[in-house]
Amino acid sequence: SLVGSEMCIRDRLITTAAQQLLAGKMTLAALRTEMTRLAKQLPEYDIVRAMYGVGETTAVQLMAEIGDVRRFPRRSSIVGFAGVDPAVDQSGKHSAKSVPTTKRGSPHLRKTLYQIVCTYLKKSPVDEPVYQFLDKKRSEGKPYFVYMTAAQNKFLRIYYARVKECLEAFDAQQDTSQR
């Protein structure tokens, strides 16, 4: 009957869609495993992984999105790259008091940074500089988006300093071992 054949087609479509979803899920898991394996070979992996709020997956995401920090001449460059720096709104004598973030750069990096800062909010680690900064901005009465973005900015500056220091030490060690 017509109803029976429609149900058979529907069942086949559902089965095919489920198989495709499962295949996609398996491919994604394989890619994540490979990315993690590659990231663990980099000298900065342990430094990034040791940062508060950064898990194994988040470390890999950060490292993949940012790449080599040595390509940024200063910390403001990496903040601008992520798009968590305030935009400039000036014209003549006019200078805006409240400006949005530039949001240039990778939205995936901004999402990862947001997830990290959310961890700070949930866990409230009082001895962590990023949380202290976030809490200070929050106690000043800043809106949620403002203090979250400021904390992302702070985290990135710390990330830049720690990873750059690690890579410079690694490079120096490589230079002395090659002599």
Predicted regions and their residues:
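Low-complexity, acidic/Ser/Thr- and charged residue-rich accessory regions of DNA metabolism proteins
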Residues: 93-97, 131-179
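Short, small-residue-biased leader/transition segments that mark boundaries at the very start
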Residues: 1-9
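Short, solvent-exposed positions on alpha-helices
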Residues: 22, 46, 145-146
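Phosphate-backbone recognition surface of nucleic-acid-processing proteins
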Residues: 49-50, 56, 61-140, 144
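Amphipathic alpha-helical coiled-coil segments
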Residues: 14-31, 35-38
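Extended, structured, electrostatic nucleic-acid-contact surfaces
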Residues: 32-54, 62-65
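Conserved phosphate/pyrophosphate-binding and hydrolysis machinery centered on Walker-type P-loop NTPases
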Residues: 10, 14-18, 38-41, 52, ...
